[in-house]
Swiss-Prot record:
Enzyme Commission (EC) number: 7.6.2.14
GO molecular function: ATP binding; ATP hydrolysis activity
Catalytic activity, as annotated: ATP + H2O + aliphatic sulfonate-[sulfonate-binding protein]Side 1 = ADP + phosphate + aliphatic sulfonateSide 2 + [sulfonate-binding protein]Side 1
Tree of life domain: Bacteria
Keyword terms, alphabetized: ATP-binding, Cell inner membrane, Cell membrane, Membrane, Nucleotide-binding, Translocase, Transport
UniProt subcellular location: Cell inner membrane
Subunit structure: The complex is composed of two ATP-binding proteins (SsuB), two transmembrane proteins (SsuC) and a solute-binding protein (SsuA).
Family as reported in the entry's similarity comment: Belongs to the ABC transporter superfamily. Aliphatic sulfonates importer (TC 3.A.1.17.2) family.
Annotated SUPFAM superfamilies: P-loop containing nucleoside triphosphate hydrolases
Protein name, as recorded: Aliphatic sulfonates import ATP-binding protein SsuB
Gene: ssuB
Amino acid sequence: MTGTSLAATYGPIAGADLEAELAQPRTADGDAQDAAVLERDGGAHALPFASGGAFGRAPRDDDDDRRGAGDASVRLTRVSKRYGERTVLADVDLAIERGGFVSIVGRSGCGKSTLLRLVAELETPSAGTLVKRGDGGGVLDTRIMYQDARLLPWKTVLQNVMLGLGRRAKDDARAVLDEVGLLARAHDWPAQLSGGQRQRVALARALVHRPQLLLLDEPLGALDALTRIEMHELIERLWREHRFTALLVTHDVQEAVSLADRILLIEAGRIAFDQPVPLERPRARASAAFAELEDRVLQRVLTGSDPAGATSAAASAGGAARGRAAQANGLRWAV
């Protein structure tokens, strides 16, 4: 099956050509050669679910009641993924509320990115059911952003954002570049941009389609600390303005607490920890409540046990939390 026929069947996903994605091994992001394939097949592709709305079986009317998910835009029911004899994900049950922001953390190799690729439908489950529903029950327009911006080096910033949209989309592309603070760089080349600016272009390229679901696969992992904070603020602002559903895979626990309403920990291919984030926005990183929640999640990742038990991490913001703040800020990476 060619990239053209795949696009006709499934529609586009930004930042990833389907033929290249399905053929490549599960390793690092693509480079300019992948970007050339992307341009060849008409730009960034979207990947909504198939017409039935689900992998494995048709969705049932009682799915919402059985899962207790309410208005879920994405639902996985007993989903497993195997590569040969190796099981990467096992019996995953997950419902993502429409308009929510969910972060997935865990050690390297635990299955985080595999779960994201299943939701993107770049891979299919070995067992179980994945259901995606857009507004009104229609197609859930999905875009994905990687750590590698995958910009075409021979096209300007504006042209990169317009990939696959045609000349009539110039006004939309300029508007979204203005939203990410790069309208003044519209006619620059990607090589003239910093790493953070390149990621802003990648974000603009995804958001120009006004997606209902944005998937973020460690998009800020290569950026310096200050640029990461600026990108956190930008992503949160755009999420609040456009109210898309967001699913973030990250190694950085502080990043997960900064952005998400809910944090999932994957261990040995299963969801081992599901933590709400009851902190007001914008998040106060220097607060005791933030530090306590960050420390709780981090310790759960590192030790495999919940130091706070069933008690909400943000319920108490006393002296113990202040004592752990320096530790939480100094050790943020769950790798």
